């Protein structure tokens, strides 16, 4: 089964333990923002390398070595149809999406992950304290109306935002009233810290006591209200990532199902990358020999009995593709 197809040029083996050390020579700080997905991954990938004039595609298998790694909560799940990217603004620089099949079985895995970090008792206590203080049962609120996908994303203007999709946003809005303060008609803030982390884990660790808005069966949150106002403006005006040529081009070349999906838009993240990468490397990345012609980077992981089926796509810019095809 390891035979390469005719277009494959090579077999690539990536030890993600050595990757952060390698990238620290290039990156001016700890891997964060769009590169944080490569931090602490403790994984090994075996990938077939497929190169054409419009893309580099790597396909194969990733094994996450550390059983306490957050990614392993997804390694034996069924791949899900990813749709939460439909609400992302056009100026999204990068995103990471996580998709599960069913919350309650997954929550057991999350509890084990918390226990391995020695955070389970603290989290249980937090929920009990909130339940007592507000005379409610948090387990009947977020878990009940969470559908199956969560996302964190960063805008070209550096703001970081998180979101989950919902089965009934109106109902959740009502149930969160006692736990919330009104900032304005659309934007609220959570009164208690740590709720999102308790129910979803690592992606929402930095959204401790966020502002949030619920719109069209999405709960969207950020650490300041102005970020959500900017999000709502993009969303209501249909200025969306899924309408951009670069995103359309990349998504057309990949399966729509995954459990973890990571995306970087080259143009939208150029300013963020410049702040994070030493200047000589940045100049090379932006050169013709570097990544200048490429529009996006996508990294998809789909659960497969404890390991991940993997797709990595580095896709050429859509306008360059059009020029190339006109020249044919």
Cite the ranges covered by each PLM segment.
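Short secondary-structure junctions and interdomain/linker hinges
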Residues: 7, 81-84, 103, 117-121, ...
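Leucine-rich, highly hydrophobic segment in Treponema pallidum outer-membrane-associated proteins
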Residues: 1-110, 248-328
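Short, charged N-terminal helix-start/capping segments
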Residues: 78-100, 131-155
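Intrinsic, low-complexity N-terminal interaction/targeting segments
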Residues: 23-27, 32, 134, 140-144, ...
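Extended amphipathic, helix-rich lipid-handling scaffolds
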Residues: 14-15, 19, 123-140, 268
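Alpha-helix boundary/N-cap detector
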Residues: 118-125, 129, 133, 170, ...
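Single conserved position on a long alpha-helix in the C-terminal lobe of the eukaryotic protein kinase
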Residues: 1-2, 96, 142-250
């Amino acid at each position: 089964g390891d035979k390469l197809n005719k277009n494959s040029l090579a077999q690539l083996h990536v030890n993600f333990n050595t990757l952060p050390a390698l990238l620290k020579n290039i990156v001016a700080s700890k891997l964060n923002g769009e590169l944080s997905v490569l931090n602490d991954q403790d994984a090994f990938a075996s990938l077939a390398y497929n190169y054409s004039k419009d893309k580099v595609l790597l396909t194969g298998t990733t094994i996450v070595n550390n059983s306490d790694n957050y990614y392993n909560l997804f390694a034996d799940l069924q791949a899900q149809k990813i749709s939460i990217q439909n609400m992302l603004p056009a100026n999204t620089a990068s995103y990471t999406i996580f998709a599960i099949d069913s919350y309650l079985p997954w929550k057991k895995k999350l509890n084990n992950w918390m226990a391995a970090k020695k955070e389970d008792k603290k989290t249980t206590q937090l929920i009990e304290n909130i339940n007592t203080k507000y005379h409610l049962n948090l387990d009947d609120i977020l878990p009940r109306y969470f559908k199956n996908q969560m996302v964190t994303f960063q805008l070209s203007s550096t703001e970081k935002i998180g979101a989950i999709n919902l089965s009934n946003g109106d109902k959740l809005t009502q149930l969160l009233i006692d736990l919330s303060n009104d900032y304005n008609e659309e934007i609220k803030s959570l009164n208690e810290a740590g709720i999102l982390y308790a129910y979803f884990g690592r992606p929402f660790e930095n959204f401790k006591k966020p502002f949030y808005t619920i719109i069209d069966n999405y709960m969207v949150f950020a650490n300041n209200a102005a970020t959500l106002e900017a999000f709502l403006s993009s969303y209501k005006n249909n200025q969306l990532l899924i309408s951009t040529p670069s995103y359309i081009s990349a998504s057309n070349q990949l399966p729509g199902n995954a459990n973890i999906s990571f995306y970087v838009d080259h143009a939208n993240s150029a300013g963020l990358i410049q702040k994070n990468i030493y200047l000589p490397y940045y100049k090379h990345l932006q050169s013709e020999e570097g990544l200048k012609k490429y529009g996006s980077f996508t990294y998809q992981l789909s659960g497969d009995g404890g390991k991940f089926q993997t797709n990595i796509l580095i896709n050429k810019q859509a306008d360059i593709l059009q020029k190339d095809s006109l020249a044919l």
